Amino acid sequence: YAITGDERYRWLAEYFYHNDVIDPLKELRDDLGTKHTNTFIPKVIAEARNYELTQNETSKKLSEFFWHTMIDHHTFAPGCSSDKEHFFDPKKCSKHLTGYTGETCCTYNMLKLSRHLFCWTGDSSIADYYERALYNHILGQQDPETGMVTYFLPLLSGSHKLYSTKENSFWCCVGSGFE
């Protein structure tokens, strides 16, 4: 749609609208619960792009609401979010400092969403998050010797990073990490 302006493609994009994910965000409601984290972020990126193409204010507001909700309530100090790929009650954050904290795909996609929002607003807090997540998580998940990457950024005291291998592991986060 962005390239052609052909409404058929816009209709197709709307076909993928996920009511269970997007509708609570339209109501500015944090209904993330224990749902799969990276199921949400790409769908919100699509809403951000929808705003850019159609000037739909609802898409803009829900994108901004989601971003602030993530950063203010669901993000750890290095800029990562999730535990074992899922949201959790932010009031129980300390119970989610595990070896499976901080899925790289989530941070990578939050950086993509951040770029959209920063272009709209120029808000320096978005750039601050971007810098923190890029340097502490994205760059921090790369093995300095081999260049391989991690699936998670473990935050549990005493835990260690498990890096991908060149031949035997190709998780989703390997692709996001390299991208």
Q: Where are each of the predicted segments found?
A:
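Glycan-recognition and catalytic cores of secretory/periplasmic carbohydrate-active enzymes
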Residues: 1-179
